[in-house]
Amino acid sequence: MAKYNAIEVFEKIGSKRVLPLFNYADIEVCKSVMRVCYAAGIRVFELTNRDSAAYDVFKKLVPFVEKELPELSLGAGTILDMETAQKFIDAGADFIIAPNLDAAVGKVCVDNYVPWIPGCFTPTEMKYAHDLGAEVIKLFPAGSVGPSYLKHIKGPLPFLKIIVTGGVELDELTISKWIDAGVFAIGIGSQLFSNQAILKQAYDLLEAKMKSIIQLTAKKEGN
C-alpha cells in the first residue's frame, strides 16, 4: 500500500524540481544511491523496472526506505502494462511512471489511488492522459526536442504539469531553459548515475553533484 498520497508525492517532486531514476540489480548499490539522494535533500525516488531483478529489488527496498529514509516516496518506473502496475502497487509503490501512455495502466493507478505519471510526446497524448487522470505527465524523450518544445506545449495547455526525462543535459544553461519553459521537474538518471561513477563508488561526488543541481533549480525558481 502506498505510503504517500498524490498531493504529497507531487509536492515532494515539485519542491526540488528533481526526480532521480535508477536501476541496478545489486540492492546495496541501490541503497547507496538512494542515501546519496536523500542526503542531498531529495524526498522522492523512481526505481525503474528495466531488468528481471527490479521487482525483487523493489520489494526489499520498501522496508529499507521505511526504516532508514522515512520521508522518501518510492515509486516504480518503466511500467508497461496493468498487471505490472498492480504488482508494484501491491508491493508498496507510492507512484507509477511509464515511458508511454496506456489507459489500462492509468485505470489501475486511479482505482488504487496511486499517482500515475505516463510518458507522452504530443499535445494530443498529454491532453488525453490528463483526461484519464494523470495529474503529472512525463515528456519523453525530452532531450530530442528541447525546452522550446515544452514552451510551445505549455502555451495552449498551461495547466499541464510536465516532467522531462530522456537525454536531458544537466548544465546550468539547459536547466535554466527548461525551467523558463515551465517544466515541473527534471528526471535525472544515467546523466548523473553513470556506470563509471557507480563502479568507482563515487558516492560523495554524486551527492555533491545532486546538491549542485538542486541549487540550480532553486536559484532559478527564486529569480
In which residue ranges do the predicted regions lie?
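Catalytic beta/alpha-barrel core
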Residues: 21-23, 43-52, 71-80, 93-101, ...
